[in-house]
Amino acid sequence: MRLIVYNIRYATGTGPTFHLPVPGSGYLRSSPRALHGIAEFIRGQDPDIVGLVEVDTGSIRSGMINQAEFIAHSIGHYSIHECKYGVRSFNQRIPVLRKQSNAFLSAPRVHGERFHYFTTGIKRLIIELELSEVCVFLVHLSLKYRQRQEQLRFMHDLIQKSSKPVVVAGDFNTFWGTDEIYLFMRATGLRSANAQGLPSYPARVPRAELDFVLVDPRIRVEHFAIPDVRWSDHRPLVCDFSVIPGGSP
C-alpha cells in the first residue's frame, strides 16, 4: 500500500513572490499552477491513500475550488475533509479560515472515517481512516511545544483503542525531529518510517524533520522517500507499507 503525506500550504506556491508585497501575503492567494503541479505529482505516484494537510476546500482564496476534491478527481479517488479547527472555534466563523482543512484521498476500500478533536491547540482535527487491515490517522500538531505534548498524549490514548495496526501521519511541527516524539513512540510502540531522519522542511533546502509517518510494529515499511518536489514549503512523504500476516513484527 502506498501512502503520500503532503502539507500543500493551500496550494499558494513558494518562492520570493510569496512574501510580496508584504511578508506572508502569499497566504491570501492560491496558485493554479501549484495546484495542478501537486495533482500531477500525486497522480504520478499512483498512491492508495493521500493525507493532505493545509487544504483549501473552497474559499475565495482558491477561487471557490475545493482543492481536496480537485486532486481526488484527478487521481480517481474520493475525498473526505474537514476544517482543521475545533468545532466551537471562532475560526469556524471567518470566511477563509473556515475552509482551511485537512483531507484524506482514498480508493474505495474504506470501511469508515471518523473525525476526532484535540482538547488543546488551535489546530485540533484528527482524521481517522479505517481500512480493512489498518487504521490511518492524519494530524497537524500545534506550533507550541507544550500543546504538542498534550496532543501527543491525547493521540496515545486514542490509538490504544484501535484493534487494527495503526499509522499516524502528518505535520508534527517537531522542530527537534524525532527527539521530540521519542517518548510518544516508546509508549505507543510506533516507529518512524523515515529511518534515516531525512528532513522535509523547507522544501527548497530541507533542514527540519517536521513531517512523519509513524507505523505500528505489525506493519512492514517496504519503501520510504521524500521526493524533491517544491510546490509547497514542505516536501511530500511517500511510504510503501504492508501489514505483516499474523500481526507479528
Where are these regions (language model features)?
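Beta-strand-turn-beta hairpins that frame and shape the catalytic cleft
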Residues: 1-4, 12, 106-111, 122-138, ...
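N-terminal, active-site-proximal structural segment of metallo-dependent hydrolase catalytic domains
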Residues: 1-74, 81-89, 245-249
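Active-site metal-binding loops of divalent metal-dependent hydrolases
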Residues: 7-8, 55, 141, 171-172, ...
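Short aromatic-enriched loop/helix-cap "lid" or pocket-rim segments at secondary-structure transitions
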Residues: 13-19, 64-65, 91-94, 126, ...
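Short, flexible loop segments at the rims of nucleotide/cofactor-binding pockets, characterized by
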Residues: 25-31, 116-117, 142-146
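Soluble or luminal CAZymes and related metallo-dependent hydrolases
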Residues: 29-37, 63, 121, 147-154, ...
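Structured beta-strand-rich core segments of catalytic domains in phosphoester-bond hydrolases
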Residues: 54-133, 225-228
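Metal-dependent phosphoester-hydrolase catalytic domains
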Residues: 110, 115-117, 130, 147-150, ...
